[in-house]
């Protein structure tokens, strides 16, 4: 397996894409520490994966919680090779005109504190261990870090900020730590919204994303969370990704190559090539 003996710390790793990443990295024989706010889901991870996983309950907005996750990871597994800042919330595409004036400041702070400051805290907390291991950071971005309409102005601005973090930290931490980013598209998950906008109990799985993306993406469907994990394994693999730092992999299902009048230009290929589906 590609990551035998490697140690990975993932924030927001107890559900959604984060959970898929934990499963994939364990399958690649890595040891994984997870910082998440849900003690119940962390306990389930440890039950499912045994000594391969360490769960740490905490809030990514707290530098002390992030430092505790880093120190407990090193105490149990001896090092940190890969850090994946992944915890986040979505603003459910709340447009500027729909943002209540009385909630705007709180909503901005909540989205940016989790989606941006939480990432900075993670790197700050893990930096000594990452430099010591000559490790790497893989930021979870989003297609909203590259295109409009993947969220409202708060989410989109936050994800564009993460793109800037990848580039700046790739410079600042070279040559000892590689820093890259993966931009997944929509995933049917438990991703929540800002509590400051009354969306803390709302999950993205309640949105008919599969139907929406089927007609928009050239690949013709919404990918599963597991299908995005290979990009993270690639960046974490020392041999395969040694030259990669400051790289941004926008996994957009072909959104960037949509035609003006249709999502995919090859819809008639099976018929024209006489291939039975």
Curated annotation (Swiss-Prot):
Pathway connected to this protein: Xenobiotic degradation; biphenyl degradation; 2-hydroxy-2,4-pentadienoate and benzoate from biphenyl: step 2/4
Binding site for substrate: 142
Protein biosynthesis listed as a keyword: no
Domain of life of the native organism: Bacteria
Known EC number: 1.3.1.56
GO annotation terms (biological process): catabolic process
Binding-site residues, NAD(+): 9-33
GO molecular function, one term: oxidoreductase activity, acting on NAD(P)H, oxygen as acceptor
Active site, renumbered: 155
Family: Belongs to the short-chain dehydrogenases/reductases (SDR) family.
Oligomer and partners: Homotetramer.
Protein name, entry field: Cis-2,3-dihydrobiphenyl-2,3-diol dehydrogenase
Protein source organism: Pseudomonas putida (Arthrobacter siderocapsulatus)
Gene designation: bphB
């Amino acid at each position: 397996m590609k990551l035998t003996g490697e140690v990975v710390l993932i924030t927001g790793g107890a559900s959604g894409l984060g959970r898929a990443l934990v499963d994939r990295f364990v399958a690649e024989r890595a040891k994984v520490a997870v910082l998440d706010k849900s003690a119940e889901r962390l306990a389930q991870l440890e039950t499912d994966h045994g000594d391969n996983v360490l769960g740490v309950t905490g809030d990514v907005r707290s530098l002390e919680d992030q430092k505790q996750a880093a120190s407990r990871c090193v105490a149990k597994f001896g090092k940190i090779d890969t850090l994946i800042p992944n915890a986040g919330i979505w603003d459910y595409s709340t447009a500027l005109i729909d943002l209540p004036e009385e909630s705007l400041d709180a909503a901005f702070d909540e989205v940016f504190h989790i989606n941006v400051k939480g990432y900075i805290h993670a790197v700050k907390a893990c930096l000594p261990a990452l430099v010591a291991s000559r490790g790497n950071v893989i930021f979870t971005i989003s297609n909203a870090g590259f295109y409009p309409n993947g969220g409202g102005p708060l989410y989109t601005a936050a994800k564009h900020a993460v793109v800037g973090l990848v580039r700046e930290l790739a410079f600042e931490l070279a040559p000892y730590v590689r820093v890259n980013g993966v931009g997944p598209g929509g995933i049917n998950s438990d991703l929540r919204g800002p509590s400051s906008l009354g969306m803390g109990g709302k999950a993205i799985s309640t949105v008919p994303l599969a139907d929406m993306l089927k007609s928009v993406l050239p690949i013709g469907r919404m990918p599963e969370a597991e299908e995005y994990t290979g990009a993270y394994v690639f960046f974490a693999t020392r041999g395969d990704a040694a030259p990669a730092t400051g790289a941004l992999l926008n996994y957009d299902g072909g959104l960037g190559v949509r035609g003006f009048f249709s999502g995919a230009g090859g819809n008639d290929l099976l018929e024209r090539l006489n291939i039975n589906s």
